[in-house]
């Protein structure tokens, strides 16, 4: 997986709490098990006025020209709630998002995001509200998210965030479960070499 140390990007505000995984990627689009191709269906029922996804909803925030190319999503509490589907972070990353900032996340979504190099950043409700106001008042504003130093820099201020040290290590080094295992390849080989022949 790609390493994540620091990211600077345009921010789009999704001013809604309790955004569930069915809103992020509706169930009718979950027929694939590969990670690509889901971005075009991200927030499908909100982005489009028709079932075929041909008529963009001009009122939905992702369709507004000022947020085109955004790579940081600013959201409200309990983002990613609902059913467990790894397709949700797949859709967000395939669309182009690298970071989601919110006061809280559903636990399963939070873990799935970290496993797929999408950084979920938890900030206080007060800090998130400040950031919403900042984005509304400054068209084209970018945030700098520094995973190594665990800070979000925006509007001349720095907002610290917490993340599990193991998860942080994996993201910074681009390690998934296979990559973590391969870090111990030499130890595994030595162990296997010590096994009795009848076990091989």
Curated annotation (Swiss-Prot):
Its EC number is 4.2.1.33. It comes from the Bacteria. One of its GO terms (cellular component) is 3-isopropylmalate dehydratase complex. CDD domains: IPMI_Swivel (cd01577). GO terms for molecular function: 3-isopropylmalate dehydratase activity. It holds the Pfam family Aconitase_C. InterPro entries: 3-IsopropMal_deHydase_ssu (IPR004431), Aconitase/3IPM_dehydase_swvl (IPR015928), AconitaseA/IPMdHydase_ssu_swvl (IPR000573), IPMI_Swivel (IPR033940), LeuD (IPR050075). One of its GO terms (biological process) is L-leucine biosynthetic process. Pathway: Amino-acid biosynthesis; L-leucine biosynthesis; L-leucine from 3-methyl-2-oxobutanoate: step 2/4. Keywords: Amino-acid biosynthesis, Branched-chain amino acid biosynthesis, Leucine biosynthesis, Lyase. Coiled coil: none annotated. It catalyses: (2R,3S)-3-isopropylmalate = (2S)-2-isopropylmalate. Heterodimer of LeuC and LeuD. Belongs to the LeuD family. LeuD type 1 subfamily. Catalyzes the isomerization between 2-isopropylmalate and 3-isopropylmalate, via the formation of 2-isopropylmaleate. PANTHER family: 3-ISOPROPYLMALATE DEHYDRATASE SMALL SUBUNIT, 3-ISOPROPYLMALATE DEHYDRATASE SMALL SUBUNIT 2-RELATED-RELATED. This is 3-isopropylmalate dehydratase small subunit. It comes from Serratia proteamaculans (strain 568).
